[in-house]
């Protein structure tokens, strides 16, 4: 099993907020909670928040969790290279389950392949001499700020390998889940039971008022709010978060431009199809007129036949 190599300055799982700083009562957040760098920093800095989020995502009780350990920590505040640096989080749950978490706000149209890559990479961890049954269950969870399948919107969806005919589960060791932060309105009763809708609202929050409201009766959200404030007060971490915001704005512009071009191409194709249909109709009309003319001429000049 991977060793516990979480970074320094991480709050313990038993952390409470009684001795921490007071967060602002109002005003806009310096960095939105959907920022993937802030998301990683929050879960790396505060183990209690990580545990609470996993409880909600896996529909578990806190007492069911003995340990959650991040196995790929980063040095918070260091600059990152978009070509080689990814912000997904690998977690070992109860020394048994491998969980991969990632926040993504820009639809790069690659999430299906990306999530499968994470899933396969984490599952392929057998060492020489180990038996296949020794493999640990792997769960890949994406928190997306867009709808993965617009034709089938769902707030929280889970995918596994099934027999396509009778839906027999092939294995319970591989699973992909997606939390659509943009469709909290579709949360089910079970989602609300485990407060997944509140977690989504936490990550979608834009103001301190929203965080204050969520944190009133929930220690996880109180811890999250205070840790986010603490993180964004640290210059190097804040600068990395803001750099990610600049990157995301650039990518969002590219995404919007791509969508606009895609719409324009579809519109031009539709116009071309209409023009082709009109041309076909004209050709048929001309052929009909030519046939009528030939018939008329044959009647007017029967000797020509």
Residue ranges and their predicted role:
Residues 2-27, 99-104, 201-305:
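Short, charged alpha-helical interaction segments and adjacent helix-coil junctions
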Residues 112, 138, 193-196, 218:
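Amphipathic alpha-helical transducer elements in NTP-driven molecular machines
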Residues 1-175:
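Accessory alpha/beta interaction modules
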Residues 45, 49, 191-194, 219-223, ...:
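Generic recognition of short, well-ordered alpha-helical interface segments
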Residues 152, 157-190, 194-198, 205-206:
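A short, charged helix-loop
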Residues 35-42, 181-185, 210-211:
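Short hinge/gating elements
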Residues 126-131, 167, 185-188, 210-214:
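Short helix-to-loop capping/linker segments positioned immediately adjacent to catalytic or ligand/cofactor-binding
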